[in-house]
Amino acid sequence: MKTRQVIPLNVTAKEFCNALGLPRRADLMMQLRDLQLVKFFKVGNKHLYPRTYIDKVQNMLLEGKIQIRTDKGEYYVIMK
């Protein structure tokens, strides 16, 4: 009997960034929240993000609607 892998509906910030191929950065996630590109909820001390926002941000990056740039170790999210 084969077992199915259960994919969680919500992910941590680390899993979110890993899915996009980015390093886990608190400032990056705060900028995405400030620009209202992602919503989150808290469980204890953890911020959890719905998995659907990974696809949304990834599509916006591919379409050139947003850019993520670095300058001296800081990450910036720029909307076009």
Residues covered by each model-derived region:
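Detector for methionine-enriched segments
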Residues: 1, 29-30, 60, 79
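Low-complexity, intrinsically disordered short peptide segments enriched in small/polar/basic residues
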Residues: 3-4, 35, 40, 51-54, ...
